[in-house]
Amino acid sequence: MPIKIVTDSSITIEPGIARELDITIVPLSVTIDGTMYSDDDLKFEDFMVKMAASKNLPKTSQPPVGVFAEVYEKIAAEDDEIISIHLTEALSGTVEAARQGGMLSGRNVTVIDSDFTDQAQKFQVVEAARLAKAGASKEEILEKIKYIRENTELFIGFSTLENLVKGGRVSRMTGLFGSLLQVRVIGTLKDRELNTLLRGRGSKTFYKWLEELSDSISSSGRKIREIGISHAQGLEFSQKAKEVLQKFVEKPISILDTNTTIATHTGPGAWAIMIDYE
């Protein structure tokens, strides 16, 4: 039996790819004005409308330990192997819930902190699933996941910091001071920490940085395997980023709506550029 690959709904992935590669996605949930929704049940566009209308910041929740245990028991027999790759513990307790669920299930589960989320998490999950489908061993898959993790960059742009302030996460972004709600901020997720790269006023902050990123990639000479762009009502900049960066990678760049978990913290107008280097 091929090794089973599991992840969570903080991943941003094309549904067709998940089906084709038999990737099991365990849904996180979000509570808006007292009503809990599973990521399975709430379309992203509907979520953004509900979040905008809500007086309070939605509350995101990791899957319960018991849900992970049930999933593992359902998809694999006792002798089968499972690799479960998840949202970084810097942002959620999902990894720990998966570990406990693995122990409870009695299955052979290896749980991995992706150190990332969104399409940066997808890079690891998709490659693991492709290798599993091809009959690779657990050791081969884990080695490849580690390589991708160590050669991935994630940049994120915030058009507003209102949700970060409400969620108490601004303190996690070093270097943020002053008038927080009016600035544009670009950060990076590295070594399980969200750090500030740049801040300024107006959308020109994003476009100037994009030029600098392009110049940096050009001068580095590093080859790129894949680029993913995700956004929360930040399509205009995302399309410009694809236009600027497509020349660096053969594979077409995916522009996707992010997920409810990430959008809760970023607020509207946010985007992320994720780069998987060869």
From Swiss-Prot:
Q: Which UniProt keywords apply?
A: Lipid-binding
Q: Which domain of life is it from?
A: Bacteria
Task: Check the record and name the SUPFAM superfamilies matching this protein.
Answer: DAK1/DegV-like
Q: Write down the Pfam families for this protein, in alphabetical order.
A: DegV
Record carries keyword Hydrolase: no
Q: Which residues bind hexadecanoate?
A: 60, 92
Q: Which residues form the DegV domain?
A: 3-277
| Gene3D superfamilies, alphabetized | 3.30.1180.10, 3.40.50.10170
The chain's coiled-coil residues are: none
A Gene Ontology molecular-function term? lipid binding
Q: What InterPro entries does this protein map onto?
A: DegV (IPR003797), DegV_C (IPR043168), DegV_domain_contain (IPR050270)
Function according to Swiss-Prot or TrEMBL: May bind long-chain fatty acids, such as palmitate, and may play a role in lipid transport or fatty acid metabolism.
Q: Which NCBIfam families match?
A: DegV
* The name this protein goes by in its record: DegV domain-containing protein YejH
Q: Which organism is it from?
A: Lactococcus lactis subsp. lactis (strain IL1403) (Streptococcus lactis)
